[in-house]
A protein has these predicted regions:
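Outer-envelope beta-barrel architecture signal
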Residues: 31-37, 67, 76-78, 110-114, ...
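Predominantly the C-terminal beta-signal and adjacent terminal strand-loop region
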Residues: 102, 251-315
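Outer-membrane pore/translocation modules
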Residues: 100-198, 266, 308, 315
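Transmembrane beta-barrel strands of outer-membrane/channel proteins
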Residues: 37-45, 73, 82-86, 107, ...
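Surface-exposed strand-loop-strand hairpins of Gram-negative outer-membrane beta-barrel proteins
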Residues: 44-68, 79, 83-94
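Residues on the lipid-exposed face of transmembrane beta-strands in outer-membrane beta-barrel proteins
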Residues: 39, 69-75, 103-109, 145-151, ...
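Outer-membrane beta-barrel proteins
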Residues: 20-26, 77, 109-111, 147-167, ...
């Protein structure tokens, strides 16, 4: 019972905080009384590139399932999304056991954005010398997130994600970010199951800009690049290496007060320097086409958020 009480109190500020009296500012518009539903068709995946520089060997493992549907729901500063991959969306669906599932959770608190991500995929393939090899028993599970801070109060970070805000005038901002991810690699090659674990932590500066092309159209682009450290646990021992990471993101969106749509993409690259000659590149990518609609949230939700605002002086 005590854990649930702490959990509810943790979420209260995120549910209540926002521009409750001023829905429209000079630079962006908010929808504090809206329940935002967003769905998308997404090409996504987490591929891995292994490079042996000393022996000039390179091969890439790509997930068998890469296309999936994703749905998210946002109210005020909370956003929850999940995605799944039906077999008919993927050309290699005849390979039993392959799967792709992901969940995303975001909290917006003032200038801060906290993200949590879960990505589980099973079944990979590799192309070597024109021949495709399948590894249905190779799977990865990635858990982690990032903490970002928006320096410029005129810039709307929410316009890029859940579309619970909309940029009215062009603005950009430096957005430094701290990230941490755990990845488990699992393979069964017929001689028992082998597992490998990595933990990545990094920090770096970023910059994002929202171009208002028209009152209903916006183009956004940005990049974050940083350094960190990666810990590799292979069972007998744990070693650490330098980590270099960079992320590119771009979105073109259309918006009305109720309906919105757009196309967006993101590419994240992690390079693990596992010694002088060995490299493990971890690539996370997606391209999505999304549509969404804003409903009026239940009056009880808005009333509860208003009471919390008044109680804690957040109005």
């Amino acid at each position: 019972m005590g854990r649930w009480v702490r959990y509810i109190w943790f979420l209260f500020p995120a549910l209540a905080i926002g521009q409750s009296d001023l829905d429209t500012t000079r630079y962006f518009k908010t929808y504090p009384e809206a329940l935002t539903l967003r769905t998308s068709a997404t090409l996504t995946g987490n591929s891995f590139v292994f490079r042996d520089l000393g022996n000039d060997i390179r091969y890439t493992l790509n997930p068998i399932r890469s296309t999936h549907f994703q749905t998210s729901l946002q109210f005020r500063a909370l956003e929850l999304g999940f995605g799944f991959s039906p077999g008919w969306l993927n050309p290699d669906r005849e390979l039993e056991g392959s799967r792709l599932f992901n969940m995303d959770f975001r909290i917006y608190a003032g200038k801060w954005m906290q993200t949590f991500t879960y990505l589980d995929q099973e079944g990979f393939r590799a192309d070597l010398d024109g021949t495709t090899f399948y590894f249905p028993s190779f799977g990865t599970r990635k858990v982690g997130g990032s903490t970002s801070y928006v320096v410029n109060p005129k810039f709307s970070f929410r316009s890029l994600f859940g579309q619970n805000e909309w940029q009215l005038q062009s603005a950009g901002s430096f957005v430094p970010r701290l990230l941490a991810y755990y990845t488990r690699y699992r393979a069964n090659l017929g001689e028992g199951e082998d597992t490998l674990h990595t933990f990545d932590i990094g920090i770096g500066p970023g910059y994002h800009y929202n171009w208002v092309l028209h009152e209903r159209w916006m183009l956004s682009a940005g990049n974050t690049t940083g350094l960190g450290i990666s810990f590799l646990d292979s069972g007998p021992e744990t070693t650490s290496y330098w980590l270099w990471e960079t992320q590119f993101r771009a979105t073109l969106a259309y918006n009305t007060d109720t309906f919105f749509a757009g196309v967006g993409g993101q590419y994240t690259f992690y390079e693990h320097a596992a010694g002088r000659d060995l490299r493990l590149d971890d690539r996370i990518y997606y391209l999505q086409f999304f549509v969404g609609y804003r409903f009026r949230a239940p009056d009880s939700w808005n009333a509860a958020a208003a009471r919390i605002n008044r109680t804690f002086g957040w109005d």
